[in-house]
A protein has these predicted regions:
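N-terminal, active-site-proximal structural segment of metallo-dependent hydrolase catalytic domains
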Residues: 8-112
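Sec-dependent N-terminal signal peptides
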Residues: 1-9
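Structured beta-strand-rich core segments of catalytic domains in phosphoester-bond hydrolases
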Residues: 79-161
Length: 162
């Protein structure tokens, strides 16, 4: 009976991280707004506090009765780079969840990307790629759409566009 319940239960979460940038300058992007010397004073303390809050938000989505079960899959929008995703999955409260992730490398001038974080126990990634969004003439480039497909624990294939 328990195994049937586990097979039919899959938690999917989407979270806008609202500019999750690290504190290091990327010379290929316009990320100057999120540096310790900027008007925002984006310090390591503020960065790690944001990582902590996001990880708590994700964990709260998996709470079931008095137990905490991490969501099986989380789409994260407005993340800067692989370094930020590494910190979130390996150096935050989520480190014990064992999440894997894939992400885009979009042409957005500030470096804003989309990531898909997933539990390898609930989702086996088969394929992922970015779908480029061509902006209308006169508009600046935007983030790509992330497409991922994989097999869920029931054996079905799940297609995700984020």
């Amino acid at each position: 009976m328990i195994s049937l319940l586990l097979i039919s239960f899959f938690t999917f979460v989407e979270l806008n991280c609202e500019n999750l940038f690290d504190t290091r300058h990327d010379s290929l992007k316009h990320d100057e707004e999120f540096l310790p010397t900027s008007a925002l004073r984006w310090t390591p303390y503020r960065y790690w506090r944001k990582i902590d809050r996001i990880s708590k938000d994700i964990l709260s989505c998996g709470e079931l009765d008095s137990a905490t079960v991490v969501p099986d899959m989380v789409v994260l929008t407005e993340v800067e780079n692989d370094s930020v995703m590494h910190d979130l999955t390996r150096r935050s409260l989520l480190r014990g969840a064992g999440y894997d992730y894939v992400m885009t490398s979009s042409p957005d001038l500030r470096g804003i990307d989309v990531a898909l974080m997933f539990s390898p126990y609930a989702f086996r990634l088969i394929h992922s790629h970015a779908i480029r969004v061509t902006p209308p003439a006169g508009f600046r480039p935007t983030r790509d759409i992330l497409y991922a497909s994989g097999e869920v624990i029931s054996g079905d294939t799940l297609h995700v566009f984020a």
